Amino acid sequence: MKAKEIRDLTTAEIEQKIKSLKEELFNLRFQLATGQLENTARIRQVRKDIARMKTIIRERELAANK
């Protein structure tokens, strides 16, 4: 998901997406440990998406404090 798409979402929607991505990341790591994961790059994508979303939430918090 691109940063521009994330910025169009509300903070509550972003937090919900973070929660679902964390669940997906947990499942991906579990699959990796059991040898069932084929697309290992997906773990990196999910981690980056979570980081992007957290960054945008933090930007909003800092902008609100100004």
Swiss-Prot record:
Under InterPro entries, the record lists: Ribosomal_protein_uL29, Ribosomal_uL29, Ribosomal_uL29_CS, Ribosomal_uL29_sf
Q: What is this protein called?
A: Large ribosomal subunit protein uL29
Any one Gene Ontology molecular-function term assigned to this protein's record: structural constituent of ribosome
Question: Which Gene3D superfamilies did the record assign?
Answer: 1.10.287.310
Which GO terms of the cellular component aspect does the record hold?
cytosolic large ribosomal subunit
Q: Which UniProt keywords apply?
A: Ribonucleoprotein, Ribosomal protein
Q: Which Pfam families match?
A: Ribosomal_L29
**Might you name a Gene Ontology BP term for this protein?**
translation
The entry's family comment says: Belongs to the universal ribosomal protein uL29 family.
Q: Taxonomically, which superkingdom?
A: Bacteria
